[in-house]
Amino acid sequence: MALTNTTITSWKLQEIVAHSSNVSSLVLGKSSGRLLATGGEDCRVNIWAVSKPNCIMSLTGHTSAVGCIQFNSSEERVVAGSLSGSLRLWDLEAAKILRTLMGHKASISSLDFHPMGEYLASGSVDSNIKLWDVRRKGCVFRYKGHTQAVRCLAFSPDGKWLASASDDSTVKLWDLIAGKMITEFTSHTSAVNVVQFHPNEYLLASGSADRTVKLWDLEKFNMIGSSEGETGVVRSVLFNPDGSCLYSGSENTLRVYGWEPDRCFDVVHVGWGKVSDLAISNNQMIAVSYSHTNVSWYVVDLNRVKKSGSVIQGLIQDKPIPAPSSALGTTLRRNYERPTTSCTGQEMKQSSEADRRSPEGERRSPSSEDEKEDKESSAEITNPEDYKEIFQPRSVISRTPPKTTEPFPAPLEHSFSESVLEKPGPVVKIVTPVIDRAGQLKGPITSSTPVQRVEPTVIAAAPRPVAVVTTSASSPSRPVVNTTKPKPSTGIILSTRNEPIGLNAGDFLSHARNAKASAMGDEEALAQIRKGHDTMCVMLSSRSKNLDSVRSVWASGDVKTSLDSAVSMNDLSIVVDVLNIINLKPSLWKLDLCTSILPQIEELLQSRYESYVQTGCMSLKLILKRFWPLISDTLNAPPSVGVDITREERHQKCKACYKQLKNLSNVVKNRAEQVGRHGSTFRELQLLMAPLDY
């Protein structure tokens, strides 16, 4: 039988390893649907472009796991809350931190930006909600009323109300200007995970762990609809941009709801597991979920999803169902009145007055401690090309991120008969999209290959990719031509890589055999496989013996002798292993260690291996922070009267350290010109070593 190809409704777009430790939170940019922020237990916030394998930017500064993230409406800023209760706000276009906000006593569990002003709201596990003025760097008002963690916050489109969902099974509506609660919805029987305002009308949707989605009338403050039949906890809800229907995301399922009367238009089974966020772009729904260190993107073609009462074979054309005899709320319900100007301080006047009455006194001016925290935060651009394309476009009037994106093409779904499984299938044409640097799709590439099943690729996230190759095709029938020039190699071998060094995977692909070539014999094949194995065994055995020797000295409690032993072995890998342990416990550092290890640090900073460079930078940073004041004071002190052997020994050690640090300053200065994470680290070291030039 012939092979039948049909376009599918939903598919997995991509899966990546987003963090070095477990992912703890993520969010999609709702404006473009093409930007993703992920937070992890590694205390980092990583920024991604949907469908691109490499991280664009990595934001650091938090000292505990990131509990919640949110973009603003223009996707130019991102705020992240940590488990320690602190908030950090970054400007993505300027690649710098704007604010560090402190005040919550427990972890941040929800965030949202005000749609028209420099305000943001945060909810915490401590059950409090706080409204922050980013410009004043302080808390404007605190809303109290929930008894358990606040899981979701949402501002109304006109910016006058704030809705909050909590583990206490309630949804509360707050008046921002009056600074008080308007009403409370209590129909849910379990924790409420998400709330969402209708884009135009006075409606509010909520999704709960009780497996229901409820709709609330914000004029009469009553429930007008409740879903039935959800198979799992409702983790995300989203109104269609035109407000015609409501999407609900639960475990492996997307449902489409209407209201007045209540009805479920469609159910789409998607293998996304526990979906975390939804966004709509180009009539496609982009969904994300995470598990451990992995993040997965999914796409649902909304053209093939039923969003009303009529359906036509193939693509679904939405037509409104006949209106019932009673007037529908969708035609008579009040709409939001959006102000033409941005939210000003006058609108929040009452809230500011309430802040003055607040017993906490959280409104404060920037202090030296805040400035120190801001300096400790950084934005590491790990993919400069994508960063400039998305956040720093050449045209001043273009939006950021770009809004004119093409929809993701759906893969082909193959239907096989039993006879097809018994013999090789016919050759079919697979259409592969080509994605340019802006994340937009170019013309497809057509290739003829026998394909059984196409699965998405799991891509490990590298802090800095070795090379970025962009392919383009002018027509479907033309072969792909690599139009980009290869970047000059930095000579650094990344510590996080997904292929062995010096091994070309293409050598293992099948090639056309030369007719004159003779088949390789069994003995020759085994010899080829074992080539290099004996050398590797000897090297690993030697390294194991060296580590055992260092460990035996370390067990006696003599750190200096064990480090000298590692240095004498003339093996940088042993030195790196010992330094990594000492760096974890800075109290082990002594001035004696500095004189022994500084020459080794110079070698580490010039190494080809990223892990060696990182260890060397960390060790040098600790030495400068802990011992530079002592070295400087000792060398600048006037000569003492009499003989002081201890002081003389200390003076000689400080003099030796100073000489070695001067040599290292030239290495650091040359390395500071690099781009990306290493460049920022060396520039930080250059600042710490600035006193050496005086």
UniProtKB/Swiss-Prot annotation:
Name of the protein in its database record: Katanin p80 WD40 repeat-containing subunit B1
The UniProt entry's sequence similarity note says: Belongs to the WD repeat KATNB1 family.
Q: Where is the composition biased (Polar residues)?
A: 327-349, 482-492
PANTHER family according to UniProt: KATANIN P80 SUBUNIT (PTHR19845), KATANIN P80 WD40 REPEAT-CONTAINING SUBUNIT B1 (PTHR19845:SF0)
Give the residue ranges for region: Disordered.
319-410, 470-492
Matching SMART domains, A to Z? WD40
Name the UniProt key words of this record, in alphabetical order. Cell cycle, Cell division, Cytoplasm, Cytoskeleton, Microtubule, Mitosis, Repeat, WD repeat
- PROSITE patterns assigned: WD_REPEATS_1, WD_REPEATS_2, WD_REPEATS_REGION
